[in-house]
């Protein structure tokens, strides 16, 4: 079975990853230090490691990114079945983009009683969208840092996905020109999206590993 590397080079690539943005979750070990992406046949495989063991999350790449998808995850042997909509993650961007002076705060996501709550050091917001199915309680802590370099797949898919879904919801389209401004490794990378109605922008911090 051939494995090919997924290059994060277009807005479509970001949207493809966005549906698994909330899946970097571990019930017992929420902080994941590294992440990588690969495509095997029709499956997008995300591999994340912590200090104890490798965590493998696999989900299917769907052609229609505008519809709500059912995603099944198996994290540390813990199965969770979530019904995710782009609206469920849109407020995460507002919490993230409120960061001052180029810092990238921890972004905490809690799902409780069918609702998702998102908070960061910069802002605290809540999302009150109900899930169609029961959602088990857990808290996810997205990593603080991201690996940044030209064409590097080490970019944190969770934070990229949050930005992409937010932009998708904001305009209701998946073909808008999102620009990912690459810079030298070890330096922050900026992304931006501009339309007649305004602009969104964000910052991806380099890995400290």
Place the predicted regions along the sequence by residue.
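DNA polymerase processivity clamps
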Residues: 1-209
């Amino acid at each position: 079975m051939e494995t090919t590397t997924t290059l994060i080079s277009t807005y479509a690539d970001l949207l493809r990853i966005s549906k698994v943005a909330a899946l970097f979750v571990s019930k017992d070990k929420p902080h994941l230090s590294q992440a990588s992406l690969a495509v095997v046949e029709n499956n997008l495989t995300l591999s994340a490691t912590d200090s104890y063991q490798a965590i493998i999350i696999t989900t299917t790449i769907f052609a229609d990114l505008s519809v709500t998808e059912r995603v099944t995850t198996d994290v540390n042997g813990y199965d969770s079945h979530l019904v995710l909509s782009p609206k469920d993650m849109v407020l995460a961007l507002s919490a993230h983009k409120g960061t001052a002076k180029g810092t990238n705060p921890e972004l905490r996501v809690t799902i409780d009683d069918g609702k998702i709550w998102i908070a960061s050091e910069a802002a605290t917001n809540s999302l009150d969208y109900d899930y169609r199915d029961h959602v088990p309680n857990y808290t996810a802590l997205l990593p603080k840092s991201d690996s940044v370099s030209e064409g590097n797949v080490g970019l944190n898919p969770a934070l990229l996905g949050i930005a992409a879904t937010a932009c998708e919801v904001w305009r209701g389209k998946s073909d808008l020109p999102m620009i990912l401004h690459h810079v030298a490794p070890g330096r922050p990378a900026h992304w931006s999206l501009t339309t007649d109605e305004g602009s969104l922008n964000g910052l991806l911090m380099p890995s400290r590993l």
